[in-house]
Structure formats: structure tokens, C-alpha cells
Amino acid sequence: MVSSKQTQLKKGKQPSWIEMYLPKEVRPYAHLARLDKPIGSWLLAWPAFWSVALAADLESLPKMLAIFGWWAVWIRGAGCTINDYFDRNFDKKVERTKSRPLASGAVSPAQGLWWLAFQLFIGLGVLYQFNVLTLALAIVHVPFVFAYPLMKRITYWPQAFLGVMISWGALLGSSALKGSVVPSIAYPLYISSFFWTLVYDTIYAHQDKVDDAKAGIKSTALRFGDATKMWISWFGVGCIAALVIGGLILNIGLPYYVFVAIATGQLVWQIFTVDLLSPLDCGKKFVSNQWFGAIIFTGILLGRLFP
């Protein structure tokens, strides 16, 4: 039998750290949680990190970032697992996804559900140290995580639902530190993250648009078609406008706006240079969004340090 490492080498791919360092029995579960592809965890974590950076004092900041980073890794893994569970029959028809553990049979549906329960337990467990509101918000978030994969079957706007779900950390960060969802902190960040998600996940959806159309999977990529760049340009405007308005409300220092300007340039670069006919380029532009999140986070910190 050819090992997964040998198969990857034959396809011209370098084996990930999962193949190199994890026991064979564990590898399918690590792949199911996309532990070798951290971009999804970053995208879930950044709204929480932004909110924490605005709400926390410098002494508590490292601990809070570690807690929400842990939460993001495991909840994102749970989201990938439930997505693959619901989509396992569709994934078999899509070139990019047919080798996923549930689609390929490396993990059975029952095993996938047990793995899902474990990830939710670990991800939510770390939040038990916070107030009741924060824990309640985290629990309310879970049905949105479960529902997202189903949206691709009923609407051409699943990316909007993803924006609602993946921006949740903006609410949790202020709640955990302030005891309530502080509107001046949480709402501008949530709105900005929502529009940002519409930009990057529409680009992401263009990778699979041909296979998705054949399989009956809906997306904004298929909805917008040749008008995609116009649509995501307006979403980008909404994202940046919310960040600027939030900064003005909180009276954040000048460095924040400098970094928002840099992030704007990064977003403009994505939108105007992405080749929507190239799955490879769409994937690269999607992954580059980890840097957009980092730029905004840096701007928030410096804006608070140098008001």
C-alpha cells in the first residue's frame, strides 16, 4: 500500500507536518480539523483578537490572546468537521475536496461525529473561566457553525452567513473583558469583519465554481459571476468604513489610521490583482488575508499605545 506521504510526493506536494510527525491513526482527524492549514483559525481568531486588543489592558493581553487563539483553533476544527460531514457526498464530486477524510472514507461518519464532540468540548471548555454572558454567547455561536455548511444548498449567499458566524469573536472579546458586549468596541469590528468575510470567501469560492455548479452547490462566486470584482470592491469599502468609524468613536490614536490605510492597500491589491479564473491565485489571495488581520491588530495596539 502506498503511504499518504508517498502519494503526496508523487503528486509533487511536500508532506505536511501531519504526515511527518503524527501517528498514522491520528492523521485523518488532524486533516479533518485542517490543522495543517491554519488560515481558517486565523480568520476566526482575528475579530476576537481585535476586540481583545481594544478591551484588554497590556498585562492581561497575552493571556487573553492565548485563550481566544485556543478557542479559534478548536472551533474552526469543529466547523471543518461538521462541514465535511454534511458535504461528504458532494466533496466526492469536487477535485479539490475528494480526498478529504470523510469523503474518501478514511474516517467514518460516526467517527467524525465523535471527533466533532471532542473538539467542541475542548474549544468551549476554555471559556468556562469567563462570565456567564460570554459562555452563553459562545454556546449560541455553535448552531451557526453547524448551519453554515447547509447554507450552500439553499442560498447563493452562504458567504454572508459565514460572515455572521466567523465574526462572532468581536462580540466575545469585549464580553469576556468588560462583562457585556460593548457596542462601541464590538459592533464596528463585527460589521467590518462581516464585509471582510464577503470579500475573501467570495474569492475563495471561485476556486471551486465549476465543480460547485455541477454539484448544485451555491455561492456568491456563482451569484456574482463576471461582476464579482465590483461586488467585492463595495464589500471592501464597507469593511474599511466600519474600521474608520470604530476608530473615531473610540478616539484611537493616529497610528491606527496609518495601519488601516496599509490594510486598505492590501485589500485593494487582493481585489484588483486576483485572477478569478485561476484556482491557484484565488487560493493565494485568500490565504493573504491573515496579513490583513495582522495589520489591523497591529494598528489597534499602536493606536492605543500612542493615542
From Swiss-Prot:
Q: Tell me how this protein sits in the membrane.
A: Multi-pass membrane protein
Q: How the protein is affected by changing residue 84 to E?
A: Reduces activity 85% and decreases affinity for 4-hydroxybenzoate 3.5-fold and for geranyl diphosphate 6.5-fold
Annotated family: Belongs to the UbiA prenyltransferase family.
Which top-rank group of organisms is this from?
Eukaryota
Where is this protein chiefly located?
A: endoplasmic reticulum
The record's Gene Ontology biological-process terms are: isoprenoid biosynthetic process; ubiquinone biosynthetic process
Q: What is the effect of changing residue 84 to A?
A: Reduces activity 98%
Q: Where are the transmembrane segments?
A: 38-58, 62-82, 120-140, 154-174, 179-199, 230-250, 252-272, 286-306
Q: What is the effect of changing residue 211 to A?
A: Reduces activity 98%
Give the species.
Answer: Lithospermum erythrorhizon (Purple gromwell)
- Induction data: Up-regulated in the dark and by methyl jasmonate or oligogalacturonide. Down-regulated in the light and by ammonium or 2,4-dichlorophenoxyacetic acid (2,4-D).
Q: What InterPro entries does UniProt report for this protein, alphabetically?
A: HB_polyprenyltransferase-like, Prenyltransferase, UbiA_prenyltransferase, UbiA_prenylTrfase_CS, UbiA_sf
What does it do?
Prenyltransferase involved in the biosynthesis of shikonin, a naphthoquinone secondary metabolite. Could accept only geranyl diphosphate and not dimethylallyl diphosphate, farnesyl diphosphate, or geranylgeranyl diphosphate as substrate.
> Per the record's keyword annotation, is Chloroplast included, yes or no?
no
GO CC term, one of those recorded: mitochondrial inner membrane
The protein in question is named 4-hydroxybenzoate geranyltransferase 1
One Pfam match: UbiA
In the record, the effect of residue 83 to A is given as:
Reduces activity 99% and decreases affinity for 4-hydroxybenzoate 21.5-fold
Q: What is its EC number?
A: 2.5.1.93
Q: Which cofactor does it need?
A: Mg(2+)
Q: What keywords were assigned to this record?
A: Endoplasmic reticulum, Magnesium, Membrane, Transferase, Transmembrane, Transmembrane helix
Query: Which molecular function term from Gene Ontology is one that the record holds?
Result: 4-hydroxybenzoate geranyltransferase activity
Enzyme class, UniProt record, top EC level: transferase
Q: In which tissues is it expressed?
A: Expressed only in roots.
Localization per record: Endoplasmic reticulum membrane
Q: Which PROSITE patterns match?
A: UBIA (PS00943)
Instruction: Give the reactions, separated by semicolons, that this protein catalyses.
Output: 4-hydroxybenzoate + (2E)-geranyl diphosphate = 3-geranyl-4-hydroxybenzoate + diphosphate
